[in-house]
């Protein structure tokens, strides 16, 4: 192999998958700083990819154990929006295929918005079935947030295009005859729950951005309905909306004044 330019070396390293590759051995002997920097970057990327693979395998253990028992339709369930002062609580139920693989999958709160959006599209493309449950602020006020979250989760399961044989749920138990396991911090421990958390988060964020367009003075597209200083000041200045949860403090206290 003739001596390559730094740019050519970069392209080569994108193709090279193993240190055993003859081209890699030649680049290793290239003493130019630019090439050595690229090799160092290649090693770091390989190390990150290996860590992501190990994390993904660790997060697949619940699903794999159930598949070994002959189950196919395993639904991961998670919610987003229990804490905000405005907007709905949104849940998702996701059934993934056996060969599903998205390295870097994690709890939606730990991912950047760009990564969440990309993973959302990939999950949509690969999933066997996805169901979403949405419960309005009015119903939250009527039955309380805990019951509303349960209801949204049951709705998400009902909206699946297949009947799940088992449920993996993030920190909740559901009144359903379908066998289930409740996993604390499940969105970081199960790929199905993690996928559900991403679907729920992106779905709710998009709804809140639409609310932001409808009520530009409130900044919903920034705080997603949570009780930030900006949001509380907007409520003081412009009033309480129908999208606000009247049973949540401090809105409840504002109404009683």
Swiss-Prot record:
Keyword flag rRNA-binding: no
UniProt main location, coarse: cytoplasm
Cofactor binding summary note: Manganese or magnesium. Binds 1 divalent metal ion per monomer in the absence of substrate. May bind a second metal ion after substrate binding.
Stored PROSITE patterns: RNASE_H_2
GO biological process: DNA replication, removal of RNA primer; mismatch repair
Residues that hold a divalent metal cation according to the record: 78-79, 170
Gene3D superfamilies: Ribonuclease H-like superfamily/Ribonuclease H
Co-factor requirement: Mn(2+); Mg(2+)
Single GO molecular function: manganese ion binding
Domain RNase H type-2: 72-257
UniProt-annotated location(s): Cytoplasm
Catalytic reaction annotation: Endonucleolytic cleavage to 5'-phosphomonoester
Superkingdom of this protein's organism: Bacteria
Any one annotated GO CC term: cytoplasm
HAMAP family in UniProt: RNase_HII_B
Protein family per UniProt: Belongs to the RNase HII family.
Job description of the protein: Endonuclease that specifically degrades the RNA of RNA-DNA hybrids.
Protein name stated in the entry: Ribonuclease HII
Species: Bacillus cereus (strain AH187)
């Amino acid at each position: 192999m003739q001596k390559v330019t730094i740019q050519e070396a970069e392209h080569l390293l994108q193709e090279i998958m193993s240190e055993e590759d003859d081209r890699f051995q030649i680049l290793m002997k290239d003493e130019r700083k630019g090439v050595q920097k690229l090799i160092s970057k290649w090693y770091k990327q390989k190390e990150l990819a290996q860590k992501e693979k190990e994390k993904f395998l660790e997060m697949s253990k619940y699903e794999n154990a159930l598949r070994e028992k002959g189950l196919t339709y395993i639904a991961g369930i998670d919610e987003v929006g229990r804490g905000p002062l405005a907007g709905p609580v949104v849940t998702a139920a996701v059934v993934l295929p056996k060969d599903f693989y998205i390295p870097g999958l994690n709890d939606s709160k730990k991912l950047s918005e760009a990564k969440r959006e990309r993973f959302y599209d990939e999950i949509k493309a690969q999933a066997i079935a996805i169901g979403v449950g949405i419960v309005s602020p009015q119903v939250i006020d009527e039955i309380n947030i805990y019951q509303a979250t349960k209801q949204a989760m049951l709705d998400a399961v009902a909206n699946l295009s297949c009947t799940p044989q088992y449920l993996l749920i993030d920190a909740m138990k559901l009144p359903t005859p379908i066998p289930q396991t409740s996993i604390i911090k499940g969105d970081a421990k199960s790929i199905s729950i993690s996928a559900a958390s991403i679907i729920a988060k992106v779905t709710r964020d998009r709804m809140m951005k639409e609310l932001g367009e409808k009520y530009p003075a409130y900044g919903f597209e920034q705080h997603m309905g949570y009780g930030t200083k900006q949001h509380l000041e907007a409520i003081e200045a412009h009033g309480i909306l129908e999208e606000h949860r009247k049973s949540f403090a401090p809105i409840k206290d504002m109404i009683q004044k």
